[in-house]
Amino acid sequence: MQVTSLAMGAVPVPERQSSPERAANSGRFDPSLAVPLTWFDRPTLDVAQALLGMILVSVVDGELVAGVLVEVEAYGGPDDPASHAARYRNGPVQAMWGPPGHAYVYRAYGVYPCCNVVTEPEGRAGAVLLRGAAPLVGLEVMRARRQAMRPGQRLLPDERLASGPGALAIAFGIGLEHNGIPLDRPPVWLQPGGTPERVVSTPRIGISRGQHLLWRFVVADHPAVSRRGHVE
């Protein structure tokens, strides 16, 4: 995996296939294949890069959906001015302090749920925001969930169903009720997928502080990336 703009050290990852599509077709979407929670017990930037190409799976209201992660953002603890952990400690944000491998779900603008994966050893805040996924299965379920939030608007193309953090959470049926759940079992889990050929790092989107940090990671040239104009 080639990373442009920000050099990182070697990142150990679970066994992967050569491509996300091959990974999806070679086995089941099964929680027995989930990435173990201990895998997330390490630096946030390492986890953020390694999440790209992994498969996010949810079974909510009996509906199975899955997609390949193509865009994420890393957020640190109190020293990261853009992090919720720098401003809050009580309420849903408590999930950012661990344990690792659990969900931190909050509502953006009071409307859209956003899903993060908690990182770092328990007691040290850190999380990776899931910003975009390329749908693999359950596309019509995703589309119905998205269209319910935008009645009367044109149908979304497949690559935009889970493009953007709010869109991803809605498409996968993730809400505030999932804050703090472990992400190695139903209703939401992560499985090893493929390894992207090239990953690009950029400034994070929609923040007013910490813009100099290149902590947004995307699969280069992927159509499901939420704001491709921000890829440099």
Question: Model regions: which residues?
Answer:
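Conserved, well-structured core segments that form or line functional sites
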Residues: 2-232
